[in-house]
Amino acid sequence: QLSAKDTFTPINDPNKLPKSALELWQGYDARAEDLEVNTIEEWKTDEVTTRYLTYKVGRFKGANSRVSAYYSFPNKPGKYPAFVWSHGGGQRAEKNRSVYFAKQGFANIDINWLGRPVKEDIDTNTDWGKVDPTQGPRFYSKALRKGWKVNLQPDEFSIDPIPSPRNSNWILLSMAGRRAITFLEKQPE
């Protein structure tokens, strides 16, 4: 069931599918939806502040998709260069990595797109809702598929009900990264 607030309207007509990378992202504004940031935990040292948080990637099939992340920044007042760290497959976001980069003078957000448990034993984590760009239950306990989706065919956990480039896992993962940039843009550091 489609909610009026879904990030994308499903495409049912093959003639309306995007035919280029530009068309694929046409009409998508990563700043349009509220990030709905929830700070779960915060740690401070003399040098760095780190927050474990979740933010909204989008709304798909009537359910919100949220990604957890570590956001770290130097405590010294000022504006800092910032970047998104997106871990490799089978890995997870790591607090120590985020702290390391903050100590080097960078604000950074280390996103936990795969949803593997974090080392701090915090229960709140990535929740993709009714879509699933993950690598399956071996890595993500809330996985909706048995494994990594490697095609553009539709299933009950993809965006479009017809073969579509928007059914690629990489669309949702790219959105998670782009929304992390939106998060960084809104920070005072």
Where is each model-derived feature located?
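N-terminal pre-domain segments of enzymes
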Residues: 2-39
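Cap/lid segment of the alpha/beta-hydrolase catalytic domain
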Residues: 99-175, 183-185
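Active-site loop signature of alpha/beta-hydrolase-fold enzymes
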Residues: 91-92, 116
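N-terminal cap/lid segment of alpha/beta-hydrolase-fold proteins
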Residues: 26-78
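Short beta-strand element of the alpha/beta-hydrolase
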Residues: 68-71, 78-88, 108
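Alpha/beta-hydrolase fold nucleophile elbow
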Residues: 188-189
